[in-house]
Amino acid sequence: MLALGLMSGTSLDGVDVALLETDGETVARFGPATTVPYGDEQRIALMGVLGGKGPVEQVERDFTLFHAQVVRDFLAAQGIDAATVGVAGFHGHTILHAPAERRTWQIGDGALLASEIGIPVVNDFRSADVAAGGQGAPLVPVYHRALAAGLEAPLAILNLGGVGNVTWISDDGSLLAFDTGPGNALLDDWALAHTGRPVDVDGRLAAAGKVRRDAVEAFLHHTYFDCQPPKSVDRDEFHALAWELVKGCSAEDGAATLTAFTAAAVALAAYSFPRPVKRWLVTGGGRRNPEMMTALSRGLSAPVEPVEAVGWNGDALEAQAFAFLAVRSLAGKMLTYPETTGAPAPQTGGRHHVP
């Protein structure tokens, strides 16, 4: 089936859209992909409803209609008729994730999107897992396993979006997955506050600074790091502690220290793997930050490479994953497992909407 995936990540950079030919078990063909950035007003609107606050209903409608325009423009640019696309996997945008309270909230109106684009839509991928007692995240490991078929294992696939998450894959295909801690969110928010740009471009700010090692050690005392995987965390969980620890730092030293926070959390996560990995493959925006990649390489014992080293598109991977998960959902296949979200049993998920 030709499936389309849409992802709006916690980094708030934009909408990733990708096409994938898949049966929900294997990947037959990668299709085109692109990212459409958010404007400042859209980013501010989304930030304003984080935590479920503010005018959620209006923001959700605007957010959904923006996705619809992204899809129409993307298909037109590729010369693809919407009638040839079997399903669209619509992640939405996470504004609240509190699995301990059995609550997770991804805004995005699946019925409205289906009506606007004329393609069946699957959305709300996380709620069933959370309702069953799982973490509702990460969701991408089953797609990682499909991609990694044929690669030497054990290996780790690290996604550095707003939050960091990792999938450990053994040579027999068994999985362990969890959120490592902060990804780019701390650094992005620091860069925005100190430079007016929502990202530390090429890690230049961090490269000019010095890491406060005492702050890194103190950061790792956050209670999240005492929890055993599978586990997941909200984008903003670490902000209060992080800001306290870098208070008074220069823009450069703060960026260097926040980069070190993320890398140290990943290094700590590696101790939870059943067996050491032979390599780390990094996807998400963090892989484009040379300072982040250097910090990871220093802290990890196996080689660290971007996913492009094995021919994958790191900018498209999460959107592709939601195309893959949408096909699995339509077929009633499992999306999550005890080893990936901590749910008591494998779970399917997603809500289906027809145009």
Curated annotation (Swiss-Prot):
Pathway(s) per entry: Amino-sugar metabolism; 1,6-anhydro-N-acetylmuramate degradation; Cell wall biogenesis; peptidoglycan recycling
Q: Which domain of life is it from?
A: Bacteria
* Keyword DNA damage attached: no
User: What would be one Pfam family of this protein?
Assistant: AnmK
State one molecular function term (GO): kinase activity
Keyword list, A-Z = ATP-binding, Carbohydrate metabolism, Kinase, Nucleotide-binding, Transferase
Protein name, as recorded:
Anhydro-N-acetylmuramic acid kinase
Give the organism, scientific name: Paramagnetospirillum magneticum (strain ATCC 700264 / AMB-1) (Magnetospirillum magneticum)
The record ties this protein, via InterPro entries, to: Anhydro_N_Ac-Mur_kinase (IPR005338), ATPase_NBD (IPR043129)
The answer to keyword Nucleotide-binding applying to this record is yes
Q: Which gene does this sequence derive from?
A: anmK
What job does the chain carry out?
A: Catalyzes the specific phosphorylation of 1,6-anhydro-N-acetylmuramic acid (anhMurNAc) with the simultaneous cleavage of the 1,6-anhydro ring, generating MurNAc-6-P. Is required for the utilization of anhMurNAc either imported from the medium or derived from its own cell wall murein, and thus plays a role in cell wall recycling.
